[in-house]
Amino acid sequence: MSLGQHESWAAQGSHKHIEMKHTFIIILTLLAFVTSSQALDNPKREFRGAWLHVIGQTQWQNKTTAQAKEYIVDQIDKLQRAGCNAVIFQVRPTADAVYKSDLEPWSAWLTGKRGKAPNPLWDPMEFAIQEAHKRGMEFHAWLNPYRVTSTAKEILPKSHISNMEPQRFFRYNGQILFDPAYQENRDFICEVVKDITHRYDVDAIHIDDYFYPYPAPGKAIPDDASYLRKGNGMNRNDWRRHNVDLLIEQLYNTIKKEKPWVRFGISPFGIWRNKRTDPRGSESTGLQNYDDLYADVLLWDQKGWVDYVVPQLYWSLDQAAAPSRKLVKWWNDNIHNTDLYIGQDVKRTMDSPDPKNHDRNELDTKVTLSRNLKNVGGNVWWHGYWVTGNYKGAADSLAKKYQSTIALPPVYKGPGKGPKAVKKIELEKSDEGSFLSWDAPANGREEKTDDAIRFVVYEFLPGEKLDINNSQAIVALTPFHRVRIANPEPGLSYAVTTLDRLNRESDPIFLYVK
């Protein structure tokens, strides 16, 4: 969702020091700008994501395949340099596909015309997954579940399912949407998710804040017919929430049946309910998930139907209708069974002066708030293009201070015992340079949750405590079995550990440079 929409709906409601340059061998070089004092407060584990959306981004349509690939590499490189460890990439904006699909047409946002394949043919999602994983980053496939069109100007072919079976859809405020009341629609959306989960090495399936449509003044949702057929005597608002609940539960079960380690994440609007509506609600006066979008995020948390939530707290710290300072604490206190990260708006954060110090922006306070709250495990930056474009120095601030160390993602819940340790660490020296290499534990033929998929390399200075809990000691997070060492001087020590698909870490194996 755009920042402008967030601001509008809130108002209406008053309503160590090492950088990685990734090729197939990771090169370790010194980062002179990182001081130990800046890195001290950076946790070893933290989710640091960024959304890269395709909808509304016409730059994709004007690029050749080679240029589009270069663009993806550039964007992911810049996110990694800013300290991010997860890419949330939009692959289904409007019942279409930014990947090869037999279920839905190619996205017009990619090629300029819905159904038109890129030429020469390539698969943007597969390419982005490979590039993220090369850099040790997670890839979350981001889908919008219900939206079919985003504007009234879009014309769908006569063969489109919304024209063939119009009763399964409704039009609202210039958009066409799947009617959440239909089991056929839930089945179809889950089939799309099953297909992605089965065919692609995604780390998560991610859906955003669009459930029932955001309310337009004076316009009622045109679902009278489906309510009469399927309401079963329920209150209409409860019935709408129930329809969304059914999809969330079915999506979670679909993903876990296909690949138990793939996570299901949701980034809802930043207000569940206001306190004046419900005593359990937040000190806010904006639009409400529960009442306006029919999305009961607290129920999903209670039922265990979601692995993580990222409430979109895109407002300034003390915004009147939706103060993010209070809302972040509310979410911390009310999400109990699900991992919680905070959606932060880069532009609003960098534009807004800190209320207690007008000589700086709100970035420091927002990061500090999230890190000081027990149940918050990280942040996700909206949008990633503002990070990669270094809006008002945002990327510099992240790279030099707030995300200056390499962070491992949090440990996730799931089956398995965790990964085995690596074996036989060696330091090789040749005309090409010095390399640290190791033998990885063998994975079986069948994919498992505790497969070894990434490796963490630690470097310790002479006399330094060999503590793998020290975030400053991490110098590489990589899927490869070999890294180049710039200056393996005598007295240095190295450790290598394994991460599995749930980011559980093996015991370290050490090497001492003599």
Q: Where do the PLM segments sit?
A:
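Aromatic- and acidic-residue-enriched segments that line the glycan-binding/catalytic groove
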Residues: A97-G112, R147-N173, Y210-N232, R276-L287
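Pro/Thr/Ser/Gly-rich low-complexity, intrinsically disordered linker/stalk tracts
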Residues: G393-T449, N503-K514
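Catalytic domains of carbohydrate-active enzymes, especially glycoside hydrolases
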Residues: E70-D96
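Solvent-exposed loop/turn segments flanking beta-strands in beta-repeat/beta-sandwich domains
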Residues: P441-N469
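Active-site-adjacent "subsite" loops/lids of carbohydrate-active enzymes
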Residues: W51-H53, Q57-A66, E70, A141, ...
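Aromatic-lined carbohydrate-recognition surfaces of secreted/lumenal glycan-active proteins
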Residues: E138-V148, H206-D209, R240-N289, D339-K347
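Beta-strand-rich modules
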Residues: I485-E505
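Substrate-binding cleft of secreted/luminal carbohydrate-active enzymes
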Residues: Y294-A320, T338-P415
